[in-house]
Amino acid sequence: MSGVATDDLFERVDAWIAQDPDPETRDELQTLVVEAQSGSQQALDDLHSRFDTRLAFGTAGLRGAIAGGPNRMNRVLVAQAAAGFARYLLDHTEGETPSVVIGYDGRKNSDVFARDTAELMAGAGVRAVLLPRLMPTPVLAFAVRHLGVSAGVMVTASHNPPNDNGYKVYLGGENHGSQIVSPVDAEIAARILEVAQGSVADLPRAETYEIAPETVEQEYIAATAAVAQTSAPRDAVSFAYTAMHGVGWRTAQQVFSRAGFAEPVIVAAQIDPDPAFPTVAFPNPEEPGAMDLSFETARDAGVDLVIANDPDADRLAVAVPDSSDASGYRRLSGNEVGALLGWRAAELASADAADGSAPFGALACSVVSSPALRAVADAYRLDFQDTLTGFKWVSRAPGLIFGFEEALGYLVNPETVRDKDGISAATALLDLATSLAAEGRTVADQLDAFAERFGFFASDQISIRVTDLSEIDHIMASLRSTPPAALGTVGVTQIDDLKDGFGSLPPSDVLRILLDDGSRVMVRPSGTEPKLKMYIDASSDVGSVAERRETATARVAALAAAMRELTAG
């Protein structure tokens, strides 16, 4: 719908421009005003898009395109967020001065947003500590606990498109450096809106913030290198590494070296931070084509593995040689890597247990991730926790020794980092690969061994993209009011509706459909895109590994077809 020119709109734009310290976004908005007042409908619609609503602060903080206006990421919005979060910390810290550590990645304006946050926090009376340079998100998450501060802020948009940026918030103390969960997000959001009633130009600033010592990164490197525990020669596995134009390499290189791994073959065009992300359309290892350059480098070098971090290095992608793929390599799914690392964690916990007693600890994954991890937990007599989507939930599982999400997120060292960490996960994966190499085996062989011991677990994800968000509400309502008795030829045995909570799970707009062959379908709206997502899982433990693979894969394909038909129209 086309917007209408109103005095109110232009007054709101003028008020925003008046408080904006960034000449780039000021000029951008002033140009749009001139064009809109001259009759440009496109400029007017753009202004309405920027000013009719604002970026919502939620449990994932803020994330959006860099541009002027309250519905974009910019210095005004970040100032409001920083001041609002400062008020929250001051309100919730008794008897001492609250403290916050602030980190930033290599995206456009990340350093500016971080310094603004440090100055505004210090001006508000919060002890602010700024990391000394751009660093991976896991280092910031580590620093919250290592420095013993009240909170953390990470300026990053992770693997979003190049023009995006974001603002992630962590809490220390009893939260152990995890990301925030409800209702904390709503409390912070309310204080941000209070700040937004005035001008950020009037907020007190101070340059009395501290710069964190270099030892913070070095302590992270030492703790992460210690994730490698095999006694086998650790330089036996060759691998290529890409930072996807992000900030992972400087830190990861030191971790790999300290752990004793072979020097990786780097994907040179992607190794240094570059906010333009020139070689990828989307800097997300899951996106088609994102790892093409990595595969080319790996083929030329003939390496055993490909290791990829996303731009802020909180995610890990792994690829193994595969002659049946045109690229020569196959990227493992997040569920495959999660299963292998979960099995590794269970083995380590079992080795630590004395006299055959049950090992201590819990394995955890989000409800949309593969049931394979539960099979591992059951086999090793470990606790298992399924959580809502997001590491803010996975990281809080009691007794956690390993957690993962299917979207390439893994938590392998909960004693130091309570968030997904692509560098420590890479260390654990390389540690596993080197121990396998000492036995003459590969990561691909270990996947077959997993299928032989626990069954073959197949997964797929399908999405329905809509132009009208009400379509998603309609589909979810229809599934609730008229639940299917069968999907294809497979009977439905149970449907769990998580909207009011289920078991230990908090309320969430998720449906879990269980079938009589043990398969499962999870249905939920996307939290970031106009999509309905369906996660399909099936397994088989009958026959050879090849037969198990064929059976489970066929079940997933049949369920995917049935769900597409059920939700069509």
List the predicted regions and their residue ranges.
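Conserved phosphate/anionic-ligand binding catalytic regions in large, soluble enzymes, centered on
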Residues: 51-71, 157-160, 243-251, 255, ...
